[in-house]
Amino acid sequence: MKVVIIDNYDSFTYNLAHLVKELGVDVTVYRNDQFQLRELEPFDKIILSPGPGIPSEAGLLMDVIRKYAGIKPMLGVCLGHQAIGEAFGAKLTNLKEVYHGVATPCTQFGIDRIFQGMEKRIEIGRYHSWVVDRTNFPECLDVTAVSDDGCIMGLKHKNYDIHGIQFHPESVLTPEGKTIVKNFLEL
């Protein structure tokens, strides 16, 4: 299997790549503005990395989702998760309280296979100031996990193999993070 990570200029991207390599999978990293969409054709799965800012400012990130939705499985992390939400019609909300390097519990609803084998309550590492808004949430997506403060921490597309997590699976603050990535790779 070959996986590509779209790097949204985030310091965590290579931690995520290292985690994928640890799981025995060939991984390539492309910066979000230094490739052409057709270069993703040889890859089996796409991971959309965390990053600063908002999805519309992240190079080809939104174009990747639009072109490969329904064609290639995707996992969006943090900014990548937000981009998935926006690509399918969700809006983002800027949080009043910023979460940077904060461990909090969240509840996953058992409806996404990336959480397979986990307890309903899991600890997650949060590094964000934006979230996908629950208001007017798109019909084509399911909320798969929420934080105790009601923020969407996970989503998936109802028809496509597309999953998003607001938190960082590669962080030591997310003890089940490696399992989440492994589950995505095995889908």
Language-model region placement:
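Extreme N-terminal starter segment of soluble prokaryotic enzymes
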Residues: M1-V4
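Active-site beta-alpha loop architecture of Rossmann-like, nucleotide-cofactor-dependent enzymes
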Residues: F12, G53-P55, V172
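Two-component/phosphorelay signaling modules centered on CheY-like receiver
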Residues: A17-V25
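A short beta-strand-loop structural module common to alpha/beta enzyme folds
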Residues: D26-Q34
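Short amphipathic alpha-helix with an adjacent loop that forms part of the alpha/beta core around
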Residues: F35-F43
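Cysteine-nucleophile active-site neighborhood
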Residues: F43-G117, V181-N183
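Catalytic beta-strand/loop cores that center a nucleophilic Ser/Cys/Thr
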Residues: D112-N159
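Acyltransferase
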Residues: V172-L187
